[in-house]
Amino acid sequence: MIELKEVLKEIVSPIVSQPEKVIIIEEASGRDVLLKLNVAPEDMGKVIGRHGKIAKAIRTVMKAAATAANLHVRVDILDYDELNETTPASDEE
């Protein structure tokens, strides 16, 4: 079975200058998969592209990969604040 999270990481990592800071959160419900992508702030423009063209291309490729696996996928590109809202807080103080 295709691991959509890994496919997205393989697409995004060569585009960004800090691939070690690529974070992908996967939420699946049946055949629906939501991938939340976060990159370093300085790489955000590289992932979105002029007029959103790179983001649209990434989503198109991911939809093709999902279709091959009989899944539906949505890719959300999060900024730092949105990532912190979706990530559970740790209990450390």
Segments from the language model and where they lie:
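RNA-contacting regions in translation and RNA-metabolism proteins
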Residues: 1-44, 56-93
